[in-house]
Amino acid sequence: MLNGCQSSKKTVTTATASPAMKNEKAERDASDLKQCQKNLNVLSRLHTTTYPSLKKNFDNLMLGASQYAGVRFQVNGQSQETIDALYRYRVSYLCSEIQQAALEVLVTRAELPK
């Protein structure tokens, strides 16, 4: 028998998160976004020079995400995964910038004059 000539069919399984895990992740994402908004508010209250540009970037990103949410289910699953990942990355990156800016301002203002 020629075993080498037979096509081997492999079953591919994909891992899917349970509804409870998805809900937990959504809650964590919402909490992270609220903290990001709080950090942005800190920059506003401290009258920093970085606030206007970070606020503009945040607002534009949220507007884009909102618009995408309105059409998300009209695109195929692979495109959804790609764009979802892109928005998660962009939000995470921007929120990291906001957090860093807030920490830098707070540390600078807490340092003793030399």
Language model features with spans:
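Bacterial signal peptide processing site
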Residues: 6-9
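Surface-exposed, polar/charged faces of alpha-helical domains
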Residues: 20-27, 31, 38-114
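Sec-dependent signal peptide cleavage junction
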Residues: 11-19
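C-terminal motif of bacterial Sec signal peptides marking the signal peptidase cleavage site
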Residues: 2-4
